[in-house]
Amino acid sequence: MHKLILFSLLFSFLGSPLIAQEAVLTPEFHKSKREALRAEMPANSVAVLFSNPVRNRANDVDYVYHPDPNFYYLTGFKEPQSVLVVYKNPQQDDLGQYVDQLFVQERDPAKEQWNGYRLGVEGAEALGVDRVLLRSEFIKSQTNFTSFEEVLIFEFKNDVRDDKNDPNDLYDLQRTFKENINYPQDFNRLRHRLLKSIRTVGKEDVETLKNEINWYAGRNESIAEDPAIKNFLESSTLEVPEDLKMQVAFLLKDQYFDVELLGQLLGDQREVKTVEEIALLKKAIGISVVGQREVMKAMRPDMSEREIQGIHEFVFKKYGAAYEGYPSIVGAGSNACVLHYIENDDVGMDSDLMLMDLGAEYEGYTADITRTIPKDGTFSEEQKLIYQIVYDAQEAGIEAAVVGSTSGQITRITQEVVAKGLVRLGIIAKEDEFRTYYPHGAAHHIGLDVHDLSNYGPFKANAIITVEPGIYIPKNSPCDPKWWGIGIRIEDDVLITEKGPINISANAPRTWEAIEELMKESSPLDQFLLPELGN
């Protein structure tokens, strides 16, 4: 009976009003996204998108499949081994006109018994794409993509395996398409973009382009040593020499594709959320907020990073979030000073801070929230001082999260607060030294990706961004040792509106006083005692 009561408590304590109402994306939603893309595509162009590959974990075990966010955004389809084609202009077949095609896996009862059901052509037709065909038809059709003015694609991933027993797998779908559009085997996206810029640059922009290329060349040996790029950098005229134009034109000859524009067009769409998307993100954020709150109540000094991670992820799954939006970051003490620390295998000291950067992924949309709390329930004086600087920086950043502002502006505002605070505490001597302890940006979009696709221009209404300043002082830093081992980040998810910013994740305590107060509350997990493991 005791166990039944305990598990009842564990499952009932999560009945929280912080969770947003249910939302769902319909075929009409995805169709509207394809139509919006078509409207912005160049004349006589075509966009071709491939599903994500199935990635191998080890031996005969694969990772859980995650659909490509852009592919899902445009189709609602979650299966691998598939292709989407979107045409700017209507195409014609025996059934009439169509503007998009979806190529999918065939049904296979034997494989479905082992690995799960497939929609097949008939099931996928419910998604509302004009033509749904078997993936083998993509190879057989031999569509002449070079007949289009522009073929819009994303750069191909290099981790696609070839299943020798499947002549129509993703590897073969991509191989056939690459041959069709003359996609180089050694394609370098940056080199391709720079060569196209050299080919089209006007004389008034030559020096600007040279400065840009020199910046890349100083960081990328393949760019620095490219013969055509070297010739451009070494030319002394304000115009691109004719022989160099011919050299670049030859290098780009018969390459019928563009790897930049599709991302830009979808970035414009995805950075502005619809009502349905905002509802899904509010749900993911609400779930993540409950995780942060329950951990604050359950935290005990002897808990390991992995135990804390487990509580968060239990909450996620309890509310129907199948996955985390990214590997959970749970770092105690100096581990918090590693920005993407994911080992999560330490216990730390009782007096350590615990930085917890986690986000539930709900129906594909991911939250991204960070809180930093004291393992023993009480901030030390040094920890309070650093925490207050980060909090003040975040307050300034959230206030600046308005229509027309940018991620860069928010970052600079938070940097100014952090720099002044670190000088005031004597941790740095000059404000321009702040990057030693605050090395990252302060804002990014969230959505189907934790760092969501965006062109990162001025914010528009209904964008959802993070605001996440931090200070990280690892051991042996050039400052008083009393600061060593303090790593603090506060991150919230903020909706941009015409009336100002709305902090969707505000119900997870942010001030050090509110955190200490919540940590005094009891947790249902206090009585969750597991038996000792036997031999």
List the model feature ranges, each with a label.
Residues 21-535:
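Active-site neighborhoods and metal-handling regions in enzymes and metal-associated proteins
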Residues 1-6:
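Positively charged n-region of N-terminal signal peptides that target proteins for export
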Residues 7-16:
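Bacterial N-terminal signal peptides
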